[in-house]
Structures are given as C-alpha cells and as structure tokens.
C-alpha cells in the first residue's frame, strides 16, 4: 500500500482478518459474534494532513513512509474524499503562483464533508501579516468562483487567521433523519463519514426501547449524544474542549433538539461531582440528582477509561462503549465484566487497510 495506490482487491481479506482478531480478543469475555460494518473501499477519509515539500519555486504534498521515513510525493490520495482529491491539485497550482502564500508553508490540513463544504488550514514557519491575509482572501475567492465551498485558515506560532470561519457544517442521514453537525478545524471529528453513519445507526438500534436518561462522557461536538437523544427522555453530556462544546451547543439548536444538556468538564471532574467529592460552579442550576441515567455512553481516547471512570461507569445498568483501541477496551473489560456482560458487539472498519480497529460493545448489568 502506498499513499497513491490502495490494495482494493485485498479489502475483504483484511476485514476478515480484523473480524477474527476482534473475536479472539473478545472470547475471554463471552462476547457474541460481532456485527461487521464495511467501509467504502476508497475515498472514505474526510480529513487529510500533508507536509509540503519545496523544490525551488515548485512545491507538492508529501507523506513519510512509516518504516523508512522516506518522503513520498502525493498528487492524489484515494483514501481521502473525492472533494479533497479535486481540491489538492487546484490549490497547489494557485499556491505555486503566489510567493507570499507559498513561502515557509510547511503543512496543509484538509477537512471535508459529505455536504460539500471543505476547510483547509495552511501552517507556516513565519509570521502572518496583512499582505498574507489579502493574498489568502484573493485565493479563497478564486477557488470559490471555481465551485469550491471553501474556508481558508492560516496558522503560525501563536497565530490563527480565520478569513471567514473556522468550521464546516456536515449533514448526515441517520436512521431517517438529516443530522447537522458543525465541525471545527483542528478539533476531533470522525474521519470516516460513511462509517460514522453506520456507528450512529448501530448505537440507535441497540438502545431502542431504552428507559430513563443517557449520560455521555467525552461527547465532542455531540456526534453521538444528538443522534441518540431520540431514544432517551434526556441526555446529559460532558466535554472538556471549548471549541467542541461550542459546536455541540450549535448542533443542539440546528437539529432542534430540546432534551440534551452539555456541561464543560473532564470525565474525572464529573466523576468527583457525581460522587459528591467536589462541587463545581459550572454545575450551578443543573440538578444532577434529578437525572435518572440508566445508560452511560463512553467513546474514550485511545488510552481507554481511567480507573476512576471505569468504576463510575459500573454503577449504570447499561454501558455503551465505542473504542478506537480494542486493547485498552479489553483492559477496561477486565473490570467492567465483573459486573456486566457483553450483549452486543460490533466491528466498524473505520481505517481500512491498516491494523487499527474501531469497535462497539453494549454491556448490561449481570442479574
């Protein structure tokens, strides 16, 4: 596999290998056979980051070989969305012709959507001034005239220049509803949009008929909270990153959802608040005791749940856990399986042709 060539003929074999590997990892926990969700075989990534290599007045996208660390020129990137691939050569041609925008540019970050919007962050090893802003504005207008629904953002040390806005608005069809999601550049979003839709629909299907409220830790821009809100009386969600909280609040309003409350705090702090260890000013006006959370949803970072949060999670009758690292999931299951059993297991091929697996488990309290 190279950046410009995907081994599409090996897609089924690599998915079969992952399915077997996940099954073996989950066997000690008496998990059922996984439901397996396929990715598109190409153009599945909505985000891409490239370093920029300068060769005299020329420049091009590069990536580094993970083994040899050699640089590889990338003119097309079939793992990325068709929109990113359409913009890549057009943007580089425009940058080649503009020394102010080209000089000291070292990275381009693309963030695209199924809705047709795209944002590009240009990263520099130099200060950005008014001349840069003027040239960037001209470039943005030129590319918009060519049909790209584009946002350009300039970044340098301690500097961020946003010509118009630093986000794109995504629209995903989820179980019969169009869900609007504001996605902010340089914040976490699900990289594989088609797989994200399948993850949301799986989470909806396994929580159908739920009673009580839902608690979500690490909610990001509200990706899961908002889709799952239809299955619960109320949703209480926590997130620490300010841009993600702001995006989540926008998404609540844009989707006309009235039963979701987002609070800005770390999972560890929330654990302290729930256990009455500490009081937080941020929770004034929120009656934690009034929530009847019978399901907790967690989508933690690769490191998994810390010990305190794992113990907090055990207090809930049902745990819905999305994991981007089955190894740390298994470490957490050593604790969680003492009180809960796995009733549903899913494999989501979020990152085709790589070793990485994303999976979901629904755990229910043992009788």
UniProtKB/Swiss-Prot annotation:
Chain residues that bind S-adenosyl-L-methionine: 190, 218, 223, 239, 299
Name the Enzyme Commission number(s) assigned to this protein.
2.1.1.-, 2.1.1.35
Q: Which GO terms describe its cellular component?
A: cytosol
Q: List, alphabetically, the InterPro entries matched.
A: MeTrfase_TrmA_AS, MeTrfase_TrmA_CS, SAM-dependent_MTases_sf, TrmA_MeTrfase, U5_MeTrfase_fam
Report the active site residues: 324, 358
The record lists the catalysed reaction(s) as: uridine(54) in tRNA + S-adenosyl-L-methionine = 5-methyluridine(54) in tRNA + S-adenosyl-L-homocysteine + H(+); uridine(341) in tmRNA + S-adenosyl-L-methionine = 5-methyluridine(341) in tmRNA + S-adenosyl-L-homocysteine + H(+)
Q: What class of enzyme is it?
A: transferase
Q: Name one GO biological process term.
A: tRNA methylation
**Which CDD domains did the record assign?**
AdoMet_MTases (cd02440)
What keywords is this UniProt entry annotated with?
A: Methyltransferase, S-adenosyl-L-methionine, Transferase, tRNA processing
Any one GO MF annotation of this record: rRNA binding
Q: What does this protein do?
A: Dual-specificity methyltransferase that catalyzes the formation of 5-methyluridine at position 54 (m5U54) in all tRNAs, and that of position 341 (m5U341) in tmRNA (transfer-mRNA).
Q: Which family does it belong to?
A: Belongs to the class I-like SAM-binding methyltransferase superfamily. RNA M5U methyltransferase family. TrmA subfamily.
What is the name attached to this protein's record?
Answer: tRNA/tmRNA (uracil-C(5))-methyltransferase
Taxonomic placement: Bacteria, Pseudomonadati, Pseudomonadota, Gammaproteobacteria, Enterobacterales
